[in-house]
């Protein structure tokens, strides 16, 4: 044990859906913790990532994308995203530099002003040439003159090291909250459910992924060090079941195989995965499911 001075800082990553929040968190902690898919609104709850760099422990909060919510679940997701802003020491507002600032982006910027928050703006996806980048920079310098701007590529890691040095410079002397090799404080059951939900998002079409959730009912470490996982895919309508199962169960078997591969990569042990489908009408309006999803 050393007597080095310990520093900590909590960092919230907020922005529109598919702006690169989850990719950035995964890049910083060096592990695929937060699920990533081409579909918007993949992240539903706050995903906590932890990285310890020498004397500094950084606690990162990946949040659901900010959009115009309609249903009860969507509204809960947006509330969840903003809730992390209040408690964080530093706010990173990530912006997709390949797109112009739209109404939702302007609403986010206005909300920062209302909350008296000075965010750090991350202009993401600079690995691809953008005709909007300079205009976004110019606009932000006028509307948020106190904020720093970091052009980055979360996917390739460009300028992420510069960002990390800045984050470390803002950390305060305080005992670490976690062990230096921890990457998250999330329960393993929750992480396992997220991994399977990612495969459902990647392998089911149109709106169906948004109509389901996944719960890990059993997470058991066996004597041979392997893990047995029982999960329930909860859907709101009976007719969704046939789509998820596929012909002769082929679809759910394929999803199970892909999910098991990802689970084994994350937990570094063999995994025995068993998937079940359960109909629970109006689960999106049930607070018990929100508690499980941590929103």
UniProtKB/Swiss-Prot annotation:
Q: Give the protein's biological function.
A: An essential GTPase that binds both GDP and GTP, with rapid nucleotide exchange. Plays a role in 16S rRNA processing and 30S ribosomal subunit biogenesis and possibly also in cell cycle regulation and energy metabolism.
Record region (G5): 152-154
Broad class of where this protein is predominantly found? cytoplasm
**GO annotations of cellular component type:** cytosol; plasma membrane
Q: What start and end residues bound the annotated signal peptide?
A: none
Give the record's membrane topology. Answer: Peripheral membrane protein
- Region described as G1: spans on this chain: 15-22
Could you tell me which residues belong to the region G4? 124-127
What is a single molecular function from GO for this protein? small ribosomal subunit rRNA binding
List the subcellular locations.
Cytoplasm; Cell inner membrane
Instruction: Report the family membership.
Output: Belongs to the TRAFAC class TrmE-Era-EngA-EngB-Septin-like GTPase superfamily. Era GTPase family.
Q: What sequence ranges are listed for the domain Era-type G?
A: 7-176
Naturally occurring in which organism (per UniProt): Rickettsia prowazekii (strain Madrid E)
Give TM segment ranges.
none
Task: Please describe the quaternary structure of this protein.
Answer: Monomer.
Q: This protein is called what?
A: GTPase Era
One annotated GO biological process: ribosomal small subunit assembly
Annotated InterPro entries: G_ERA_dom, GTP-bd, GTPase_Era-like, KH_dom-like_a/b, KH_dom_type_2, KH_sf_prok-type, P-loop_NTPase, Small_GTP-bd
The UniProt entry, under Pfam families, shows: KH_2, MMR_HSR1
PANTHER family on file: GTPASE ERA, GTPASE ERA, MITOCHONDRIAL
Enumerate the residue ranges of region (G2).
41-45
Name the residues that bind GTP: 15-22, 62-66, 124-127
Query: Where is the region G3?
Result: 62-65
Which CDD domains does the protein's record reference? Era, KH-II_Era
């Amino acid at each position: 044990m050393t007597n080095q001075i310990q520093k900590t800082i909590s960092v919230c990553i907020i922005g529109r859906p598919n702006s690169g929040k989850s990719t950035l968190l995964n890049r910083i902690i060096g592990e695929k913790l937060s699920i990533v898919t081409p579909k918007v609104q993949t992240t539903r709850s706050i995903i906590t990532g932890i990285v310890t760099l020498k004397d500094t422990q950084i606690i990162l909060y990946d949040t659901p994308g900010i959009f115009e919510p309609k249903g009860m679940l969507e509204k809960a997701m947006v509330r969840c995203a903003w809730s992390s802003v209040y408690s964080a020491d530093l706010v990173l507002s990530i912006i997709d530099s390949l797109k112009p600032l739209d109404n939702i982006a302007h609403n986010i910027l206005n909300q920062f002003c209302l909350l008296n928050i000075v965010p750090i703006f991350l202009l993401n996806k600079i690995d691809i040439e953008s005709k909007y980048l300079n205009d976004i920079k110019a606009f932000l310098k006028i509307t948020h003159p106190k904020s720093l701007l970091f052009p980055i590529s979360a996917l390739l890691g460009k300028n992420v090291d510069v960002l990390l040095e800045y984050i470390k410079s803002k950390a305060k002397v305080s005992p670490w909250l976690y062990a230096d090799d921890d990457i998250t404080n999330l329960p393993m059951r929750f992480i396992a459910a997220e991994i399977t939900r990612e495969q459902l998002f990647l392998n089911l079409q149109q709106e169906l992924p948004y109509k389901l959730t996944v719960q890990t009912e059993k997470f058991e470490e066996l004597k041979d060090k392997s893990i047995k996982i029982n999960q329930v895919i909860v859907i709101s309508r009976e007719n969704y079941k046939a789509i998820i199962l596929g012909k002769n169960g082929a679809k759910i078997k394929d999803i199970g195989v892909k999910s098991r591969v990802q689970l084994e990569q994350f937990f570094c042990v063999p995994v025995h995965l068993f998937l079940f489908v359960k109909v629970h009408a109006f689960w999106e309006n049930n607070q018990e499911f929100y508690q499980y999803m941590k929103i």
